[in-house]
From Swiss-Prot:
Encoding gene per record: murC
Described function: Cell wall formation.
Protein name (record): UDP-N-acetylmuramate--L-alanine ligase
Classification via InterPro entries: Mur-like_cat_sf, Mur_ligase_C, Mur_ligase_C_dom_sf, Mur_ligase_cen, Mur_ligase_N, MurCDEF_pg_biosynth, UDP-N-AcMur_Ala_ligase_MurC
NCBIfam families membership: murC
Metabolic or biological pathway: Cell wall biogenesis; peptidoglycan biosynthesis
Enzyme class: ligase
Subcellular location field: Cytoplasm
Top-level taxon of the source organism: Bacteria
Cystines in this chain: none
Family membership noted in the UniProt record: Belongs to the MurCDEF family.
Main location: cytoplasm
Keyword Cytoplasm on entry: yes
EC number of the protein: 6.3.2.8
Species of the source: Photorhabdus laumondii subsp. laumondii (strain DSM 15139 / CIP 105565 / TT01)
Length: 491
């Protein structure tokens, strides 16, 4: 951003008093790194710490941020404020040092709320679909020439980053309900995509508490703000009468204000009509597969329509939508001639979905777009608590694929829960008689095991939220070919 654009921005976004140096603990996370990137581009001095380098930290280093790959008290030297990821514990040395030095320690969402304070905020919340919906809305606003700032939880492929500082008053942000921190936000427009039981430890196992928290979030809107709510979701629909704000509903339902009809999928694209009250219908070509993505697009249409964005800009943005990282992310189509000698090819798709509903949506999109292909899934369960709480749902959903390779549970710091491990889940799926899962406890063996099960007309889904994305990238880089060491080790 040049000096003139920054001056224009300062006209409606004043600086944070005496704050000059902002330190992030856990800066490598997508959400944390995105906020840090926006603040770096606004001219603040940025530093941060994490355990290992990744694309987020490398991008921030290019912007001049000082990144430490350790957690030490001296890292916060001269910081005006310390921003802590929700994954950071209270006894972290940097947090302890900041409190002893009386430096304010805030959560990620509090800093996001500060970014939103003087802007026209659009916040996207819900159990599933937040990242993609945020990216779609950002793409439409950019197409319309509105140059928004956005902060997303995933890579926005068209921008090549998780976050971007725009010169306008618009801020489009993913809102995180996992720790209820989205209650810090005070947007002008809020989207609720859906609500399911997830992160229930935050809500003390009480689903009513979770629902009330979403209502409280919507009541952070000013009385003249707008809630955009998916009426297809039964829990969201149930909450509508309890929301005292202007509401626009969307979905496939006949009751929806912004309604999807005539949906068809051909390969990776969706074709459908969006009907809007008292406005011309939109014939949408969406460059993203699955009915779930049509719903995400309908939410984006509802937000854009409220802003007065033209139908032509909406359609152009959705047709050219490049997607987000690890959301049905097509990594290539690879020949198997040198993989297992069987010939043919295999498509490789990487997907972040780690809740049964998300996994089910990915499988359905794959079936609809490529009905002649076998679905070979490599799945890594994420957290023992989630596996325990949604055990039967996982077993039912995973039973839909043709071949299943199961990795060990990615613990995310949790202790092992007996009966909620991958071996138990494989045993349960096998007992149902349709599928014989293959447990691959050693990630280094995945490529070799995969080579043995491919038959030349497969769609490989690499599925999960842990470190399985590295496996997907490795498969793409090696074109699915196991190394000699893998073959020998496996043999």
């Amino acid at each position: 951003m040049n000096t003139q654009q920054l001056a224009k921005l300062r006209a409606f976004v004043p600086e944070m008093r005496k704050v000059r140096h902002i330190h992030f603990v856990g800066i490598g996370g997508a959400g944390m790194g995105g906020i840090a990137e926006v603040l770096a581009n606004e001219g603040y001095q940025i530093s941060g710490s994490d355990l290992a380098p990744n694309p987020v930290t490398r991008q921030l280093t290019k912007l001049g941020a000082q990144i430490y790959f350790n957690h030490r008290p001296e890292n916060i030297l001269d910081a005006s404020v310390v921003v802590a990821s929700s994954a950071i514990l209270a006894d972290n040395p940097e947090i302890v040092a900041a409190r002893e030095a009386r430096i304010p320690v805030i959560r990620r969402a509090e800093m996001l709320a500060e970014l939103m304070r003087y802007r026209h905020g659009i916040a996207i919340a819900g159990t599933h679909g937040k990242t993609t919906t945020t990216a779609m809305i950002s793409s439409i606003y950019a197409q319309a020439g509105l140059d928004p700032t956005f902060v997303n939880g995933g890579l926005v492929k068209a921008a090549g980053t998780h976050a971007r500082l725009g010169s306008s008053r618009y801020l489009i942000a993913e809102a995180d309900e996992s720790d209820a921190s989205f209650l810090h936000l005070q947007p002008m427009v809020a989207v609720i995509t859906n609500i399911e039981a997830d992160h229930m430890d935050t809500y003390h196992g009480d689903f009513e508490n979770l629902k009330q928290t979403f209502i409280n979030f919507l009541h952070n809107l000013p009385f003249y703000g707008r809630a955009v709510m998916c009426i297809d979701d039964p829990v969201v629909k149930e909450l509508i009468p309890r929301v005292g704000r202007y509401i626009t509903t969307y979905g496939f339902s006949e009751e929806a204000d912004v309604r999807i009809t005539h949906y068809q999928q051909k390969g990776a694209q969706g074709y459908f009509t969006v009907s809007r009250q008292d406005m011309a219908d939109l014939k949408v070509v969406l460059n993203a597969p699955g009915r779930h993505n049509a719903l995400n697009a309908a939410a984006a249409v509802a937000v854009a329509t409220e802003e007065g964005i033209s139908g032509s800009d909406i359609l152009a943005a959705l047709a050219g939508f490049q997607g987000t990282g690890r959301r049905f992310d097509f990594l290539g189509n690879f020949s198997l001639e040198h993989v297992n000698g069987k010939g043919g090819s295999a498509m490789l798709v990487d997907d972040y979905g780690h809740h049964p509903t998300e996994v089910d949506a990915t499988i359905k999109a794959a079936r609809a777009g490529w009905p002649d292909k076998r679905i070979v899934m490599i799945f890594q369960p994420h957290r023992y608590t989630r596996t325990r709480d949604l055990y039967d749902d996982f077993a039912n959903v995973l039973n839909q694929v043709d071949v299943l390779l199961m990795l060990d549970v990615y613990s995310a710091g949790e202790v092992v829960i007996p009966g909620a491990d991958s071996r138990s889940l494989c045993r349960t799926i096998r007992s149902r008689g349709k599928l014989d899962p293959i447990l691959v406890s050693d990630p280094a063996k995945v490529t070799a095991v995969l080579a043995q099960v491919l038959d030349g007309h497969d769609l490989i889904l690499v599925q999960g939220a842990g470190n399985i994305g590295k496996i997907a990238r490795n498969l793409a880089e090696t074109k699915l070919q196991p190394s000699l060491n893998e073959e020998k080790h496996n043999g």
